[in-house]
Amino acid sequence: MTKENKLIVERPFRNPHHTASKVALIGGGKEAKPGEISLAHRGILFLDELPEFNKSSLEVLRLPLEDRQVLISRANKNCEYPANFMLIASMNPCPCGYYGSSEKECTCSSNDINRYLHKISGPLLDRIDIQVEVQSVDYSKMMNISKEESSNEIKERVNKARKIQEERYRQYNIFSNAELSPKLIEKYCQVDEDSKKLLEIAFKKLNLSSRAYNRILKVSRTIADLEGRENISKQDIAEAIQYRSLDKKYF
């Protein structure tokens, strides 16, 4: 409910500043009020300049990302708030922003880069399903967008995929692939032998955790849904693996 006591009919989008405290993010205080993660329930929590957040503030996100809820304990009461949000975060590759750039030389020392990147812990990064490194866009490519898929076309595909997932999981009272438990992953994310071999290679080469393994399967299930296919292909698995390699490259 809003301050005007009207029902919220749009998904929330929360964008807290990087100076936000642990209490501001997860909730708490004398009255055990909900924090940003609960205010973003069924919506998006966007953390811009992720390494600029206090590391201890970021670490409190780990459990809610798994449980999709948060328990706030006070001396006289315990409050449980929902926290089923989509975390979207952005960051530069280094303090100056040009590490790995082909356009401009990075001015940071190796120690500066390591300190900056390691503000994001491995366990937190392991809970982020899709990790994408984005290069700067060349002007000529930016202007040549006539053949690209439009936002409306992408939106239509996403809506179709969401409807597929809502129908598929109706009996479990969940709405998306992201909410799949390990047991449901085994049922709905089945792959062929070639895909299993590819997963095994990636698991060993990238030293993936079991959590990362399950998230690759969930992302590949989503890729297949976006393409309108019932079965997960080897290509879907390969694409999903590419979205998990960033933490092994820099962290």
Place the predicted regions along the sequence by residue.
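Histidine-centered active-site/metal-ligand motif
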Residues: H17, H41, D236
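Conserved P-loop
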Residues: M1-E10, N231
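Hydrophobic alpha-helix-in-membranes signature
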Residues: R11, N15, N92-C94
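Short, basic, glycine/proline-bearing loop/turn elements
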Residues: T19-V23, S102-E105
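Conserved alpha-helical scaffold flanking the Walker A/P-loop in AAA+ ATPase domains
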Residues: L7, P12, A20-L45, N78
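A short alpha-helix capping/helix-coil boundary motif
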Residues: M1, R14, L39, A178-E179, ...
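Basic, amphipathic alpha-helical bundle interface domains used for macromolecular binding and assembly
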Residues: E31-A32, L50, K55-F251
